[in-house]
């Protein structure tokens, strides 16, 4: 609200969610979450110092960047979860208090398996963000058409049966992550449901299936090895990672732009082995 633009609000929300996701994934069962505003009594107005809360959430965000987005620690230390010049501290504290009441890991799916948070987040990107940013993301229906036209589902079955692995998928301009998310959903559904009967029955394939698609609450483990996304826009790269997690995956390799603008943070040198 106020003088804060829609794009700034969107990125602030993304970064706060990333910090909360990291906190939920890494906090021990016997420890309290750091992503919250602590109270010293039953009085809701008796809250901790806002600056101390901001510093703690900011540290969470920086840890999330290095752990989940492959950001070098030196660069992460220079970044802030929310720019206080664009959004006042009182608004940041209010946002944290609102988000702390929800679990983004446990509460992700509905009873019928629908990724409610993922669908909600994608709708924000598709219907709101693009209009203010001037970026146009490919509609989900077109993405699905392209994936099926490329016969990614059949190729996945063929690769597992013949080579005991999946195809490698890379989106060099990942945008909001829609291609990667739909690839992930389609491949997982193909292997586990639609074409499961087409998998060969032998120990190697059973082991590959169990290692990469089981248990059901972590059925996208395979993405860690086979899905890659690159996005030069650092903030949008962060949004992709959040989008992937909210749609059921925290494993995909997402690389966002660095100072060189190449979007490939871990790589310094490239060796061309052949012309293929």
Regions found by a protein language model. Name each.
Residues 118-148, 152:
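Class I SAM-dependent transferase core
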Residues 3-8, 106-110, 132-136, 230:
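Short, charged/polar micro-motifs that form catalytic or ligand-binding hotspots
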Residues 18, 25-129:
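Long recognition/docking surfaces used for binding and targeting
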Residues 1-29, 33:
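Accessory nucleic-acid engagement/destabilization modules that flank
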Residues 7-16, 93, 114, 118, ...:
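Non-catalytic, well-ordered alpha-helical scaffold segments
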Residues 1-4, 97-104, 169:
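Short amphipathic alpha-helical segments and their helix-coil junctions
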Residues 1, 272-276:
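Short, intrinsically disordered, charge-balanced linker/junction segments flanking boundaries
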Residues 139-273:
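Conserved S-adenosyl-L-methionine
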